[in-house]
Amino acid sequence: FIKSLIRIQGIALILLIGIFSILFYLSGKELWIFDFMGHYIPNVFSEVTGGREQGFFLVQRLYIFLVGLSLCTLSVANMERLPNWNYCHRKMYVAGGIFGGLALLAVIGVFCSFHENIKTRSFYSACQEKYEKTPEVRVVSHDIELRRAGDSLYMKSHLVLVNEGKYPCSTFTFYLNPGLRVDSLWEGCQQVAFLREGQILSIDRRLCAGDSVSLQLEYSGKIDERICYLDVADDVYSSFKVFPGGLPYRFARCYAYVGDDFMLLTPESIWYPVTSPPVVTSRDVVMRGMYFTRYTLRVVGEKDRVVISQGKCLREKDSRLFDAGHALPALSVCMGNYERKYLKDAGTLYEIYCFKGHD
């Protein structure tokens, strides 16, 4: 295309070298739009979770293909032809313009998707900073019931909260993944009103110093990964992890996963309600002390999968109950097609779980 525009071969060659140098420099700088070789986009496929960010990968490669097709078509249109073939020139220009327009739409789609994620994370950070100075109450015990259907979660929580401060509080807050909708909130037989803003669940309920309250929550929905690690800079969050050893492979970041074959939920995704955020986003707020809670987790279903969580597992008819027997700072759960291998030595049980065929 450059050679068809600039008839002098030497100048065209120098210009091409300059363009390629600029493209190599800009690769990975801004949403990998200029990464024509695909070195800076996620290209690793997992047998467990599949290909993360597959949509972005396909759109980016489609954009590069359309740009190349547009330039090839326009270069043909610029070639000198016989006078009675002028109509062919117009067709090539139209085709090149269409391919270029489609490539532009693909770029706009990538930009909108990335900037929407950054905008959403900024909203979550603003919500947290707004409520970070609200007096905290401690969750003494928390009984969780989890049921999964596809990539959706249906959960129940029974919490006992205590105001361990010296002063009464008129309002306290919960943090819960914004992708999970609160279906009901009860205190005994009385329904409790609440205000939901992003990941914040604000409850107007007076709690005197030393008093406790028991609440029951029902919530459901899909996990929103954008709530994880709000203290991480946007450019780091949008980047992809490099494969160890300097190999040209990139991992897509995945902070939570819910599916039929695999599930991983960590405290950073706030998959159950807590009164203390996992990270602090404001410089004016000092990270508060770590609270320990007596957790129990009941996972309903998942008969054909191995479920892993903290505590001793008690199998029941259609569920599994995990109880550590002591207070924990947080709770995680993992489910998959695992094989369990264990060794008992001097009264101590050592366990390791690995995917079948990957040990």
Regions found by a protein language model. Name each.
Residues F34-H39, Q54, Y87-S152, A252-V258, ...:
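N-terminal, polar/Ser/Thr-rich
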Residues R196, L201, L297, Y338-D359:
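Juxtacatalytic substrate-recognition/specificity segment
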Residues Y154-K156:
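Short, solvent-exposed loop/turn segments enriched in Ser/Thr/Gly
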Residues V160-G165:
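Asparagine-centered strand-capping/turn motif at beta-strand->loop junctions
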Residues P168-C169, N177-S238, D284:
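A surface-exposed beta-strand-loop module
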Residues F1-N78:
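Hydrophobic alpha-helical segments
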Residues E218-A330:
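Extended, low-hydrophobicity, Ser/Thr/Pro/Gly-biased non-transmembrane segments
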